[in-house]
Amino acid sequence: IMGYKGYQMEDKDYLEFYEKLQYLNVSIVPEQKQGYFQKKIQVFNNSVGYASKEAGGNLIVKEQWLENPEWTIYIQIKDEESRELAERIMARKCTYMPYLGKNDHMADISGMCIVSGEERFPKNETADSLVPEGAVQFDWDEMTYRYEEYLPVGLKESTNLYRTHRFIFTDAEMDQCMQPVYKVEGRNLLFF
């Protein structure tokens, strides 16, 4: 969206997009029952000789992607970088076409708006967003679902590979919040 450089930058510790956006706070609400999306696996076979250095020159690639994912993503506007990102999203002004993981999986960005939220520390209410592990103590007695997954939260400086953190999506009530929860459009959101 912002036009920052990515993986072709080999002379810096971090990639430009990460240097600029690593402090951006987001909250992600899966718009799928229980937060789980069906996955699809496709195997590609490229048998042209230059595709692989292996004997026989046959390259086999196995890809996995989510089927019809849908999230509502909230961006906390707190500095010039996040303000510019919000303005570009609202104006549908992207330097490059946004995509999900791979450029043949285009992102469909819709329903953009600027909203306000109220900072709270609720008890006996559910979180509507993904919750970083350790941010909330839950009462697991009455829950009907609990989805957990390790997701990328940053890059390692030495390798530019993902740093991951465990996230929880559940209908269990929050017992204690270690970080603020924002009430936005009737939803309880945690930012990370």
Which functions belong to the PLM regions below?
Residues 23-192:
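Internal, well-folded beta-alpha domain core
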Residues 1-9:
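N-terminal ordered "arm"
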Residues 9-19:
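Short, glycine/acidic-rich hinge or "gate" loops at secondary-structure transitions
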